[in-house]
Amino acid sequence: MAPTVDIKNLIYPWLIEAEEYSFNDINDGIRLHLNESPFPPPDFIIEEVKKYLHLGNRYQHPSLLERLRELMAEYNRVEPKNIYPTPGGDGALRAVFYNLIQTGDKVVINNPSYSMYKVYASVRGLKLTRVNLIENDNWWKMNFEKFLDEAKNARLVIIDDPNNPTGSPMLKAEEDKVRALAESINGFILIDEAYYEFSGYTVAKLINKYPNLLIVRTLSKAFSLASYRVGYLIGNEEVIKNLMKGATPFDISLPGYIAGITALENPSYVRKIVEEITKNREYLLNGLRKLGLKVYNSLTNFVFVKDERDLLSPLLNKGVAIRKPIIGYYRISVGTKEQVDTLLKYLGEIIENGNSK
């Protein structure tokens, strides 16, 4: 007879208590809840990927990794040795959480911020400190002095810039603030620039000046490659070299490599996507404000709305998904002009009919 084992006793308590990433999804309808691009990848990427689908029985050749690093470095005006390609931006976050910090270490983030920071911290058994953002008219801003004070005994600080879910700039690549953090912390500074293509600012030029500075990037948003799972870390050569030792073999799929390489060889299409989404974002902002909703300015592909009513459920019933990251606030991804019009129409009906009470 097999010995009786309470399996929970074999699992670390912090993993049992860890939080999960959760959201409401829809199979059909208008998806404005995951900050995806509403535009599919251009045909030239799809056609290039198709050429390699018959090689599904083979692992990826190392030359693909080398080429992707070269292109990512060129795109960011750094060296390939400063680039670590990962399966999406979340792969970059995982690399940091699982290799540069250990159970019991302190991590400091803004509140609110990207929800996966909290998930990774709880799964790893880390001490998480959250510093509340400050509402500033139609924007949100960091409480930088408090954040800096908390950073002094932290192993890792993470700043998503622009911030998710508020869409507001945080450090805005101001070197004085980066320097202050770099000099205060006995650990790493991780700047999550997932929305760099929309904000236009970056701290990439500072990685050699501040060797404990790391940057997360993704091709999921402006490049329209979310399901291909291509992201990367930018950092000091020594940090990147050692992080890559922990990479699993072939962790980016062959279609991901081909899509990423083809996109970065032809990046001009991204500018058109960013321009269209930016135009639609301003259209969405104005439309929401005309409905009487409190909505904040944004430097991303989403907007942040303050409202105590239940807007989530009635919109889901109409086939439109948005996100409610915290109580009393909604995050709405920017869609096509047609999707924005549909959303505004439904929201107007919901508010007028009082179904959101």
Swiss-Prot record:
<keyword id="KW-0032">Aminotransferase</keyword>
<comment type="pathway">
    <text>Amino-acid biosynthesis; L-histidine biosynthesis; L-histidine from 5-phospho-alpha-D-ribose 1-diphosphate: step 7/9.</text>
</comment>
<keyword id="KW-0663">Pyridoxal phosphate</keyword>
<dbReference type="Pfam" id="PF00155">
    <property type="entry name" value="Aminotran_1_2"/>
</dbReference>
<dbReference type="InterPro" id="IPR004839">
    <property type="entry name" value="Aminotransferase_I/II_large"/>
</dbReference>
<dbReference type="InterPro" id="IPR005861">
    <property type="entry name" value="HisP_aminotrans"/>
</dbReference>
<dbReference type="GO" id="GO:0000105">
    <property type="term" value="P:L-histidine biosynthetic process"/>
</dbReference>
<dbReference type="GO" id="GO:0004400">
    <property type="term" value="F:histidinol-phosphate transaminase activity"/>
</dbReference>
<feature type="modified residue" description="N6-(pyridoxal phosphate)lysine">
    <location>
        <position position="221"/>
    </location>
</feature>
<dbReference type="InterPro" id="IPR015422">
    <property type="entry name" value="PyrdxlP-dep_Trfase_small"/>
</dbReference>
<dbReference type="InterPro" id="IPR001917">
    <property type="entry name" value="Aminotrans_II_pyridoxalP_BS"/>
</dbReference>
<protein>
    <recommendedName>
        <fullName>Histidinol-phosphate aminotransferase</fullName>
        <ecNumber>2.6.1.9</ecNumber>
    </recommendedName>
</protein>
<dbReference type="InterPro" id="IPR015424">
    <property type="entry name" value="PyrdxlP-dep_Trfase"/>
</dbReference>
<dbReference type="InterPro" id="IPR015421">
    <property type="entry name" value="PyrdxlP-dep_Trfase_major"/>
</dbReference>
<comment type="similarity">
    <text>Belongs to the class-II pyridoxal-phosphate-dependent aminotransferase family. Histidinol-phosphate aminotransferase subfamily.</text>
</comment>
<keyword id="KW-0808">Transferase</keyword>
<keyword id="KW-0368">Histidine biosynthesis</keyword>
<keyword id="KW-0028">Amino-acid biosynthesis</keyword>
<dbReference type="GO" id="GO:0030170">
    <property type="term" value="F:pyridoxal phosphate binding"/>
</dbReference>
